[in-house]
Regions:
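Beta-sheet-dominated scaffold domains
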Residues: 399-667
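N-terminal beta-propeller domains
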Residues: 1-61, 251-406, 470-486, 747-751
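Long, charge-dense tracts
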Residues: 89, 96, 102, 122-129, ...
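Short linear interaction motifs
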Residues: 21-24, 70-88, 329-353, 399-409, ...
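Surface-exposed interaction regions enriched in Ser/Thr/Asp/Glu
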Residues: 217-221, 286-300, 322-329, 333, ...
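Elongated alpha-helical scaffolds
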Residues: 85-106, 417-420, 427
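Extended beta-strand solenoid/passenger and fiber regions
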Residues: 118-125, 593-667, 702-741, 748-793, ...
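Beta-sandwich interaction modules
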Residues: 84-89, 401, 406-409, 685-690, ...
Length: 901
């Protein structure tokens, strides 16, 4: 089938001066919110003066540039954009695109945390365990090298003096914790500690002490706290920071009191608790798990992936990820444990290579590690508790192998998460029903080399990836079979081995169309190609009924291509200008430009097709203008003329409505091109098309050109055996076509050469005229010293009688240097010996003034040659579709060898 034409949407970027392709090194991406919001964007070099203000540009599907703002607080978001195109990874989900800089090493926040007031052992707790008579309760503070002891002795139980607690509390006859604590607090408050201030808070059964430095500087000061009593310390105890078990902590304390529980298991079982008072100040409350106040609070958000947030239609903001309120940072820090019980994720200190979503988790690939966030908490990579592990805790797992494994690609499948490194592939899965830290397993599944700069893609149930050689590209297909089985891997590019060049650097897929495509984009180190290499399959159940490789030639240097549903979007560059174009991959277009009398809807098969206009607004807009003096129509184009392409115009309309408002529906012609003060236009001589201005479409021809392989006799109905040695004489070929218009057939026979002209280079002449036409469809051959030259090294202008070939660089003249004479370059210009074959068709009928299309036709091509003596091509460059459905042949088959019967 002839490829669809690309519709011109808009010129989205024009260079500041000249024809320099200023977006050539950009990282391009595609965002699909819904059918109304579709965007194409790119990340540029912020250090380039042309892009300093806008290092990210985004356009909607109409080609209108969107507003992109860059937050500068808490850090300048632009600083994150400091690398090249291959070092960005972009992951889009709904309204948020996660942008990862693969060269940015992730850092933790400072240790100790910035602004912390915590000083180890600057707080203490004195707890009365039991109240006894005639006991001396002692408390000693040691600040520096100085001891500050205080004590209180309880009354003797035999003292029978009458008590008068109302008038003289110190004469109280009963021992109470309150009396002991009051006395100790009074004594502690009376201490004079040079350069320090001691604060004592009395609770029901304990005293809380804190020591601060007087004046500026460190607010808190460390001290040693010890207690004893006259019976060996069984009635009173104290601690500053550490306890052996949680049971040693008092039921009452002050808000924010922190304590470290050092269990028998050592550092791996140590945890921190913080007291939260019921009234927010002191008294009763609860001890809750907290983090070590001396360790980092978490991750430095400025070094982590940033988000491109679609805040409104055509409006984006680039920033550190934030919560739904738009002000609170989304990255969560460490809230419990320390660097042992709640360590940093493995990507800290290294670079993140790719981000992904899987099983309701955000994941990162770093070196040979896979890190996944807490379940349903995408920006949290720290544990819930230092005491136990939960199923929703983060997953951090290593895929160590005997081969170097630096992960750079990931794709989810029903069997698990497929991980890709340069030399090996892995699967991350869980034998349990859900993926948890304890059930996650990584296992190697295959060992294929792949290009680390081209991400793998999935096409339905198949995964495709590429491997580069010094001269061409291999393409593999992988189908997983389960966590315990190796996948089935096929070299799907074997049939076109060495056809796909090594310059491709992008791979995309369209699962609903069973299609993959490869292309090389425009960049400083490589001028963008105009070709897309595509592979399409047709499956019925588990069987591949048909598969084919083919190539599309786009109207400009390809910068970006993406397929959304059944629409292919592309950005192409020409003379420094960037055009947004689109094509429908189905026969039913989204917009109807032409409808035949029997209701068939088609779009023009022209490149850069658009309604005639010069692209200006208001009274300056010109569409179709008739010049009565010269008797020609000017059909204006809204973009820079593609001088290497053949222009074409087409009259659109709707034949199913009795051609209402249309007088020449389906009329097409190849015009000439010209320019005036209103812009560039296509010139149609001898016709006044101004009355049809709304129906005039302008664009460029492109070729549908298929060279068929050799024909051999099939020995078995299944097509498993062919007779390659037999003498096969083809009498005629019959081609069945579907919905099609003009189609031609060309044959090249051995021993036949077209007209030839020879010249000799003189070092200055670049243009050489030949006395015969050179038609692209017949094949043009230009040789220098016998070597065929690429079409990009010369240009051709032709008429019906002659043609001129103009070289980009003049062929060299004869020269002599160091007694060595180099002859002048010999120039040969000829055709590729393809000639048109007139077909035979049955008589038919058509509706006058309708588009020249038929639902089905059969063309009979006379050949009368041996199958190895000719080649045949199917060719069309009309602005209408062509659908080749089948081919049959008639002829004489004669086996060459005797056979036993």
């Amino acid at each position: 089938m002839k490829r669809p034409g690309f519709k011109f949407v808009k010129t989205i970027y024009t260079p500041s001066s000249g024809t320099n392709p200023e977006l050539k090194d950009a990282k391009w991406f595609f965002i699909k919110r819904d059918n109304l919001e579709t965007y194409i964007g790119c990340i540029l070099d912020k250090d380039d003066s042309n892009h300093t203000a806008k290092p990210i540009r985004i356009w909607n599907k109409d080609g209108t540039e969107c507003t992109v703002t860059f937050e500068s607080s808490p850090a300048d978001a632009k600083l994150y954009l400091d690398t090249t195109r291959d070092n960005y990874d972009i992951l889009t989900v709904q309204d948020t695109s996660i942008i990862t800089n693969k060269t940015k090493a992730v850092a933790a926040l400072p240790t100790p945390p910035t602004g912390t007031t915590y000083v180890a052992n600057s707080r203490g707790t004195v707890r009365i365990k039991t109240v006894a008579y005639s006991i001396k309760y002692e408390v000693n503070l040691k600040v520096g090298s100085t001891n500050y002891p205080v004590s209180f002795t309880t009354i003797n139980a035999e003292d029978l003096t009458a008590a008068d607690s109302s008038s003289n509390p110190s004469d109280e006859k009963y021992n109470t914790a309150k009396r002991i604590l009051d006395s100790l607090k009074t004594a502690l408050d009376a201490l004079s500690i040079s350069g320090h201030t001691l604060t004592v808070t009395k609770l029901d059964s304990s005293l809380e002490l804190s020591l601060k430095t007087t004046g500026s500087g460190t607010p808190y000061a460390a001290f040693e706290l010890t207690t004893t009593d006259s019976q060996g310390g069984i009635h009173i105890d104290a601690f500053t920071e550490q306890v052996g078990t949680q049971a040693e902590l008092p039921a009452q304390s002050v808000q924010g009191r922190e304590a470290k529980v050092v269990a028998l298991g050592g550092a791996n079982e140590t945890f921190w608790l913080e007291f939260f008072a019921d009234d927010g100040t002191s008294g009763r409350g609860s001890w809750e798990e907290s983090k070590d106040p001396t360790v980092s609070d978490g991750l430095n958000a400025a070094t982590l992936p940033h988000e491109l947030f679609n805040s409104a239609s055509n409006t984006f903001v680039f920033r550190q990820p934030k919560k739904a309120d738009g002000s609170t940072l989304a990255w969560k820090g460490r809230v419990i444990g320390d660097t042992i019980t709640n360590s940093n994720p493995s990507f800290v200190g290294t670079t993140i290579q790719q981000a992904f979503y899987h099983n309701n988790r955000l994941g990162f690939l770093t070196e040979d590690n896979v890190s996944m966030s807490k379940s349903n908490d995408f920006f949290n990579f720290f544990y819930t508790s230092a005491l136990t592990s939960t199923d929703d805790d983060p997953i951090d797992i290593n895929c160590s192998s005997i081969r170097p494994a630096v992960l750079h690609g990931v794709l989810p499948t029903a069997q698990g998460l497929i991980l890709f490194s340069r030399n090996q592939q892995f699967i991350l899965f869980s034998d349990a029903e859900i993926l948890t830290p304890s059930s996650a397993v990584i296992r190697g599944i295959s060992n294929y080399e792949m290009d680390p700069t081209i991400d793998p893609v999935d096409v339905g149930t198949t995964i495709n990836f590429v491997s580069k050689t010094p001269s061409y590209t291999r393409i593999f297909g992988m189908q997983t079979r389960g966590s315990e089985e190796s996948p089935v891997v096929m070299d799907i590019g074997k049939i076109v081995s060495e056809w796909v060049p090594d310059t491709v650097n992008n791979l995309l897929s369209s699962p609903q169309n069973s299609l993959i495509a490869l292309y090389g984009d425009n960049r400083s180190t490589y001028v963008g190609d105009k070709n897309i290499y595509m592979f399409k399959t047709y499956n019925v159940g588990d069987k591949i009924i048909m598969q084919a490789w083919f190539q599309w030639d786009l109207p400009g240097n390809i910068q970006f291509v993406s397929v959304d549903s059944d629409t292919m979007w592309s950005v192409v560059e020409g003379s420094g200008k960037y055009h947004l174009i689109s094509a429908s991959l189905t026969q039913t277009p989204e917009e109807t430009i032409m409808t035949t009398a029997d209701g068939q809807q088609i779009n023009p098969h022209m490149d850069m097709y658009t309604a005639a206009t010069n692209g200006l607004a208001g009274g300056s807009e010109k569409k179709v203008v008739y010049d009565s003096a010269g008797d020609f129509s000017k059909c204006y184009i809204p973009y820079a003329d593609l001088t290497t392409r053949n222009p074409v115009i087409l009259i659109a309309g709707n034949a199913s409505q009795d051609f209402a408002g249309v007088t020449e529906f389906g009329f097409t012609v190849n015009p000439t091109r010209a320019t005036d003060s209103d812009g560039t236009y296509f010139k149609v001589i001898g016709k006044d098309l101004s009355a049809q201005a709304a129906n005039v479409y302008v664009g460029y021809q492109y070729n549908y050109d298929v060279e068929l392989p050799k024909t051999y006799y099939r020995l078995s109905p299944e097509g498993a055996q062919y007779d390659y040695t037999a003498n096969l004489t083809i009498a005629r070929m019959k081609f069945a076509v579907g919905l099609s218009s003009v189609v031609g057939f060309k044959v090249k026979s051995k021993g036949y050469r077209g007209e030839l002209a020879e010249f000799t280079g003189d070092g200055s002449t670049t243009a050489f005229s030949v006395p015969f036409p050179l038609k692209e469809e017949n094949g043009i051959v230009v040789k220098l010293d016998g070597a065929k030259q690429a079409s990009s090294t010369y240009s051709v202008t032709t008429t019906d009688a002659q043609a001129t070939v103009t070289f980009n660089t003049a062929p060299t003249a004869a020269s002599t240097a160091a007694n060595v004479t180099t002859p002048a370059q010999k120039i040969e210009i000829t055709t590729d010996t393809w000639y048109d074959v007139q077909t035979a068709q049955d008589l038919g009928q058509y509706l006058a003034d309708d588009v020249p299309l038929t639902d089905s036709s059969v063309f009979t091509i006379p050949i009368h040659q041996r199958s190895d003596n000719f080649n045949i091509r199917v060719f069309s460059n009309s602005p209408f579709p062509v659908a080749l459905t089948s081919m049959m042949w008639e002829g004489q088959y004669s086996p060459r060898f005797y056979r036993r019967t």
